[in-house]
A protein has these predicted regions:
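N-terminal Sec-pathway targeting helices
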Residues: 1-18
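Predominantly soluble domains enriched in secretory-pathway, periplasmic, or organellar proteins
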Residues: 16-265
């Protein structure tokens, strides 16, 4: 009986070692850039036209998706070779804020709040706390802050808020602020849940989400879910696997031979 147990233990250790070895192999050697095989190295356009890109940062590479070509992946670039891009990469934050200068308010999400706060831009006095009616959250599970994504539409008075535990985006009309609270317009269910871990990933791998409007207001990009939403129809028009495994994203426009970063300050 002891010999059988020792053999079983040895076999278990061997299997565990093999699985660990395979995990390391597949995570470091066999995963292509941007999770797509045969991706070309991105090169700046030379045709003189304006090109708009959704750029996803994944495993040390910048993945360039062409906004005007149905979100097509057109190339990748190691961040180590693109300092001009690396310095513009947004940092992570537990408290997300967006400023609406037209209405003199700041929208904020924070730990422990499944919802969004509206503050007076000048005094920072709290005006409203808007919660997501009909949605709940268990603080012991899921990301905190749970509303880990805020984005103001650049072309209309709309605030988009990511409800990560429920994998839903809540859209609000904010045209009446500061006189009246945000008015709920619609809830958009994501095609993939914001749960589990990003892969490949080296640290802070749990999916928590992010939101980004394109500078022209046509699309919203959802980090850690990968969805691209048409803001006119509020329908999902694409899913980017790189964005499903990253929440770090920004828009890069190539204009007149130079990079521009709309929305970045």
């Amino acid at each position: 009986m002891k010999r059988v147990w020792l053999r079983a233990a040895a076999l278990a250790l061997a299997v565990a070692g093999a699985v660990a070895g395979l995990t390391v192999y597949f995570s470091t050697e066999n995963i292509p850039r941007c999770l797509v095989s045969g991706v070309d190295t991105w090169r700046p356009p030379t045709d003189g036209r304006t090109h708009r890109y959704e750029v996803v940062i994944l495993d040390g590479s910048a993945c360039f998706f062409d906004m005007d070509r149905q979100q097509r992946l057109v190339g990748a670039l190691p961040l180590s070779r693109a300092q001009w891009l690396a310095v513009e990469t947004p940092a992570a934050s537990d408290t997300l804020r967006v400023t609406d200068t037209d209405h003199g308010v700041v929208f904020e999400t924070r730990r422990g709040l499944l919802g969004v706060r509206a503050l007076d831009l000048r005094t920072k006095r709290r005006l409203y706390v808007t919660r997501f009616k009909g949605f709940t959250w268990n603080p012991r599970f899921g990301p905190d802050p749970p509303s880990h994504g805020l984005s103001l539409a650049p072309d209309r008075p709309e605030l988009w808020v990511l409800d990560a535990p429920n994998s839903v985006i809540h859209i609000f009309d904010v045209s009446e602020l500061p006189g009246a609270p945000p008015r709920r317009l619609e809830d958009v269910r994501l095609s993939k849940p914001i749960s589990g871990e990003e892969n490949p990933c080296k640290r802070a791998c749990g999916r928590i989400g992010s939101l980004l409007h394109s500078a022209d207001g046509r699309f919203v990009y959802v980090g850690d879910a990968g969805d691209v939403i048409d803001t006119r129809t509020r329908e999902i028009v694409a899913n980017l696997e790189a964005l499903h495994n990253s929440r770090v994203q920004l828009e890069v426009d190539w204009v007149g031979g130079k990079a521009a970063f709309p929305g970045r300050k």
